[in-house]
């Protein structure tokens, strides 16, 4: 059993990564293997709508997507984490969502039946839209989306500031516990 946390922030070691590590720790405590996959520094281009993925489970764009897609395909649970940039998820995570989503969707709904959900970090506004944006991706692709004690959102702008948001940390922790619970039930 494995859960991966994909961090869509271009800032290494920032609030989104801190929150994702916190969530993954809760999952690991329940005996599920975890892996953090930061997209910072990677080259993830947007989808060009070439439709090559409709006939082959790959993308012809030459960048860092396919090794991550293979990890997504092998994982039992996927968490997508993004800070809010201008009221939306980052371009980095959206490029991954578009392309990995199309590849999976056109190739036997490859993510259907996996567990997944979002984590969002915001300075102030845009968190609800970004949370919905990420959640809808999971829903369209047939994921089981576990609950938490609130929306999986935390507050933080300056590096490390998210650690002061006790409710946000607790929500991410409880989400992680729900992810592990659901993965274990589905694998039983």
Identify the function of each model-found stretch.
Residues 1, 29, 67, 139-188:
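Glycine-rich phosphate/pyrophosphate-binding loop and the adjoining helix
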Residues 1-32:
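N-terminal beta1-alpha1 ligand-phosphate binding loop
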Residues 32-42:
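A short beta-strand-loop structural module common to alpha/beta enzyme folds
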Residues 33-35, 58, 144:
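Conserved beta-strand segments of alpha/beta enzyme cores
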Residues 42-72:
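Cysteine-cluster motifs in flexible loop/terminal segments that predominantly coordinate metals
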Residues 60-144, 149-150:
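Helix-loop-strand module that forms the ligand-binding subsite of alpha/beta enzymes
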């Amino acid at each position: 059993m494995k859960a991966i946390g994909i961090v869509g922030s271009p800032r290494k070691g920032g609030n989104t990564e801190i929150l994702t590590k916190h969530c993954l720790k809760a999952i690991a405590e329940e005996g599920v293997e975890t892996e953090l996959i930061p997209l910072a520094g990677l080259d993830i281009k947007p989808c060009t709508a070439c439709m090559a993925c409709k006939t082959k489970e790959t993308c012809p764009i030459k960048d860092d997507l396919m090794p991550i897609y293979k990890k997504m395909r092998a994982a039992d649970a996927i968490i997508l984490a993004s800070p809010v940039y201008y009221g939306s998820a980052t371009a980095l995570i959206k490029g991954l969502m578009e392309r990995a989503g199309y590849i999976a969707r056109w190739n036997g709904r490859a993510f259907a039946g996996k567990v997944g959900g979002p984590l969002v970090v915001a300075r102030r506004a845009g968190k609800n839209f970004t949370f919905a944006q990420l959640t809808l991706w999971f829903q369209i692709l047939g994921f089981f989306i576990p609950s938490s004690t609130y929306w999986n959102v935390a507050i933080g702008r300056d590096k490390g500031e998210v650690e002061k948001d006790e409710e946000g940390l607790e929500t991410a922790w409880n989400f992680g516990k729900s992810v592990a619970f659901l993965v274990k039930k589905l694998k039983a």
